[in-house]
Structure formats: C-alpha cells, structure tokens
C-alpha cells in the first residue's frame, strides 16, 4: 500500500526509500505565515530531527492582501531561527511544488490542526505527488496550539489585543 501522505510516527511498511535522495534530506515548510505563530514554530521544531535541512518558504501571492509585508515576515521568521543552522527562510511566488523541486525537497512538511485541515492537506498532497513526485509529511498539531492560526492572530491585532502569547518568543 502506497500513501501520498506519510505520518511521521509510522511510515508505510512498503515505503520505497530508494526514491529519496538521502545525501541531504530536505523538507520544505510553506505558508503565507501572516504572521508566523507558535503553532508554525512547533511544527518546524518537531520536524528538525527528521531532516538535514528545512527551508521555510514564505508564499507571496500578488492577488492576496497581507497584514505584514514579505520582508517583515522574512525578518520575523529569520530572527526566530537565527541560531538554527539547518533552517533557511526564503520567499517564493509560484506553485509550492515548483518551489519544492527547486529546493530539491524530499518532503513537503505540513501541520494539521483538525479534520478540515487534514482533508485540505490530503488533496494538496495528492496534487503535489502527481505534479512533482514529492511526498507530503503531516505532523499533527500539539493540542495546546490547535486553536492558534494566523487569521486568529490578525483578528486580535485588528481589535488591539495583545497577541504575544500566540507568537514565538524571538
């Protein structure tokens, strides 16, 4: 049985590791990160032991309105991981699968908070596998962070609330 989504805690028994470039195991973690939350931070830190290199890709879509500029998001995330040599932060403005291929990614890393997230990520994983041959690795959200989202943080900011508890400390 071959699945397009691999759970970090149990790889399928027939997983074909020969398809993966094992010289440098690279994962990409992508999103708009407007802003980058403690939930995002948790997923990246939990994925770190699985990879030699993680590229955090900040998606930039000209048709989308952001609260923070791509430069501000890049600065925020770079500051958070300044002491982590395995992490790179980059922006991209094309398909995630094209970004993954450019970065020679072994996996696309995604966090899942709910059934709704799972269903969406499952569809995306299937498309990415079909278009680019790259598997998606799902990491389930720590229950402490499952209610945290960038849109929640933006809403709280809009109403002048303190959001520091939802953002990484650096």
Question: Where does each model-flagged region fall?
Answer:
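Low-acidity, Ser/Thr- and Arg-rich intrinsically disordered low-complexity segments
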Residues: 2-18
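Nucleotidyltransferase catalytic core that binds NTPs
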Residues: 15-170
């Amino acid at each position: 049985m071959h699945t397009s989504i691999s759970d970090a805690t149990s790889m399928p028994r027939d997983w074909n590791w020969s398809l993966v470039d094992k010289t440098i195991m690279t994962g990409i973690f992508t999103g708009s990160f407007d802003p980058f939350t403690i939930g995002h931070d948790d997923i990246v830190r939990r994925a770190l032991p699985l990879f030699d290199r993680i590229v955090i890709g900040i998606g930039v879509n000209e048709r989308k309105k952001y609260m923070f500029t791509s430069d501000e998001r890049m600065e925020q995330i770079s500051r958070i991981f300044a002491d982590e040599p395995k992490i790179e932060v980059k922006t991209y403005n094309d398909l995630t699968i094209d970004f993954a291929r450019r970065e020679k990614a072994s996996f696309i890393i995604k966090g899942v908070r709910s059934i709704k997230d799972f269903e969406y990520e499952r569809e995306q994983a299937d498309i990415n596998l079909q278009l680019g041959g790259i598997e998606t690795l799902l990491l389930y959200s720590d229950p402490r962070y499952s209610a945290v989202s960038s849109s929640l943080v933006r809403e709280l900011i809009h109403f002048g609330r303190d959001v520091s508890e939802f953002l990484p400390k650096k």
